[in-house]
Amino acid sequence: MDFHPLVVHFPIAFLTVYSLFELIRFQRVLEKPYWFFVKKVLIIVGWAGSLVAALTGFIASGWVIDGPRIFLMHRSFALLTIILSTVSAILYLKNKHNKVLIIFALLILISITITGGLGGAMVRGTTFDPLMAPIFKLLGVY
């Protein structure tokens, strides 16, 4: 059974919400005592879930090293998302006020969007989302 579709959406949700929370910089929100704990849970659970999602993806693909360009790009951006979330989690645990986390949050959102678009295109075809068309052309998956 292919568990990848069942597992993959949880880390996407956690990392997306973490990234959006990291980008919110309203003083009133930052003063909440639980704010940093919530973000810490989101980044750590999202990171751990992304590892499980990647593992189930590799299992579903039969541990294939090579394949169609869209598959290779999907895998590359998934690994980029894992790397970005790993660095973000480490930076966050060292200093939750690090301004570099804002840049990483934006990069995580971009990486998740591209990874998800490529994954959706593998299942639904490259014309399922017209907003992804410029990215698909840029990446050469058409």
Name the predicted role of every residue range.
Residues 1-142:
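Polytopic transmembrane helical bundles with strong interfacial aromatic enrichment
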